[in-house]
Amino acid sequence: MADDNGFLKGPITRLFEKVARWIGLSINAGPVLAALFMESYDTGNRMCSDDICKATGYSRANAGLIISQLEALGVVEGRRDYDQTGRGRKRVLYAIDGTFGDIFNLGVMSLLDRLGAMMKDIQSIDDLRSGREDSLVPMLNDIRKVIQGRIESLEAVSSAEITR
């Protein structure tokens, strides 16, 4: 992957650091995402872990950990390079699996999961209270209303096409 213009050190890296945080990963995943996206758009090729290390400056262990996290989320797909000659284990070539919209929706789904967990907590509090009327009722109703509104908004966002 060519880095002739220093993109991985500047605004593109910062953008992908924010993307990494959006999907629940450390900002350290940002340069790996940037390298894979740039390679995808630049050449359409996959990258081996050595190429990712060279592009990001990360050690093999650090790059491997980040790649594993991205694979677990379904953001990155690895395939063995059967064109590689010689003995031994074939290297794995990595590429982004899906579109930027798919990755964006991972962040939305994460928020929906957290809001759903909050709704379950409210339901547990209601169940423990066993129908007692007290000062918690208005507070819980307000919280429930806000969370439900956010869930509906996020569901609309995740199903909408981004047109900007």
Model regions and ranges:
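Short helix->loop/beta-hairpin flanking segments within DNA-binding domains
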Residues: L25-N45
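Short, cationic-aromatic polyanion-contact patches
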Residues: L25-N28, C48, D81-L106
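Amphipathic alpha-helical dimerization/coiled-coil segments
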Residues: G101-V146
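Short alpha-helical segments that sit at the start of domains
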Residues: D3-V32
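A short alpha-helical element within helix-turn-helix/winged-helix DNA-binding domains
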Residues: N45-T56
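Helix-turn-helix DNA-binding helix
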Residues: A63, I67-L70
